[in-house]
Design a protein with these regions (language model features):
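N-terminal capping segment at the start of a domain
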Residues: 28, 33-63, 75-85, 89, ...
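Alpha-helical metal-binding/catalytic segments enriched in His/Glu/Asp
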Residues: 124-126, 139-145, 149-200, 323
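Short, small-residue-biased leader/transition segments that mark boundaries at the very start
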Residues: 1-6
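His/Asp/Glu-rich mid-to-C-terminal helical/loop segments that flank catalytic regions of hydrolases
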Residues: 26, 299-336
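Second-shell loop/turn segments in exported
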Residues: 26-33, 49-59, 74, 111-115, ...
């Protein structure tokens, strides 16, 4: 009778619900862990005056790198190597006008006459090991900025909230989303935080030049400035650069915006020769397919006025979600 069949039907129904929940849950668990409150906490710390503008080779950027490591440990992401830090050295000549520094990663021998000071820098590198330990994908952002210029009247600290505390917050939240998903990715996922970008992409160049598995890196996703409105009337605007030879990168974002109702209106830019003034250039030169999120220029770019209170927080969250979905596919899809 139906009465006797009810428990069986109920069990069947519950099993189906469980199947449905597990089918949707891993990626969506990750997606749900991305929050505006975490975005704000990370950026407000990194772009605070105490961090003195995070100039590469100076105290503020070292504090920033320690902070990033402490969050990776808390999230549960292991270091890529024995340490989370990848130290490297750069050399500088005299202080230039405007307190900017010129840095030469070349051999010190060539520069002996000119070297004014040696700068120690360090990338931060975490990893979630994949099932296929031969292949890697990387998501990264630079954490350094322009430091302090004592010659300026008024505000002398280049806080770099958009450039690039915004990008750092995205990489950290994507790391947490992978852990929160509860599912091991197919490929190794590296979470990279570059030092010395403002001085000539030094950290990412050093990583690419010294990486023993460069030929097994399948893709790199970059953030540089993902927090501002280029035009007030277009709060959802973001430029989405990607390697033209991989048109599926464009399809991924279009599909996910529809599927998850993400509030983004991307300017899709397929690049035949992806270079550009950010760390994606270091990877593109090595022939690695790239994606780069960038919300475009604004009057506070490279000014002491690049403050956290001018950011579009919701946009950063939406970009973080979209790029987590990109990385989920990049780490799990067989081909792209």
């Amino acid at each position: 009778s139906l009465h006797d069949a009810l428990p069986i039907l109920l069990i069947f129904f519950l099993c189906n619900v469980a199947l449905f929940v597990s089918a949707q849950s891993h990626m969506e668990k990750g997606l749900q862990s991305i929050s505006r409150s975490s975005t704000e906490a990370i950026i407000n710390f990194l772009a605070g005056d105490e961090l003195q503008g995070r100039e590469a080779g100076f105290h503020g950027s070292r504090v920033a790198s320690e902070y990033i490591v402490s969050l990776l440990q808390w999230i549960g992401v292991q270091p890529l190597n024995e340490s989370y830090f990848q130290p490297f050295e750069a050399y500088r000549k005299e202080r230039q006008k405007k307190g900017r520094l010129e840095v030469h990663p070349d051999s010190i021998a060539k520069l002996k006459q000119e070297v004014h000071q040696k700068l120690s820098m360090r990338n931060v590198l975490g990893m979630i090991p994949g099932k296929n330990t031969k292949e890697y994908v990387i998501v990264g952002a630079h954490f350094d900025h322009l430091g302090i210029d004592p010659a300026l009247d008024g505000d002398q600290i280049y806080n770099g909230a958009d450039d690039n505390a915004s990008g750092v917050s995205a990489v950290l939240q994507i790391a947490r989303a992978f852990v929160a998903s509860g599912k091991q990715p197919e490929r190794n996922v590296i979470f990279a935080f570059w030092d010395g970008e403002e001085k000539g992409l030094l950290g990412s160049k050093y990583f690419v030049q010294t990486c023993p598995f460069i030929s097994r890196i399948k893709g790199y996703l970059n953030f540089d400035m993902i927090g501002r409105n280029n035009k007030p009337q277009q709060p959802e605007h973001v430029v989405y650069f990607y390697t033209a030879a991989h048109p599926v990168f464009g399809d991924w974002l279009k599909e996910d915006i529809k599927k998850y109702g993400l509030r983004l209106s991307p300017d899709y830019r397929a690049w035949d020769n992806p270079v550009g003034g950010s760390d994606n250039g270091s990877f593109a030169k090595a022939g690695i397919p790239i994606i780069w999120y960038h919300t475009d220029g604004h009057p506070d770019y490279h000014q002491p006025s690049d403050h956290a209170d001018r950011l579009n927080w919701d946009k950063i969250v939406e970009i973080t979600k979209a790029s987590f979905l990109n990385m989920w596919k990049m780490s799990n899809e067989r081909e792209f």
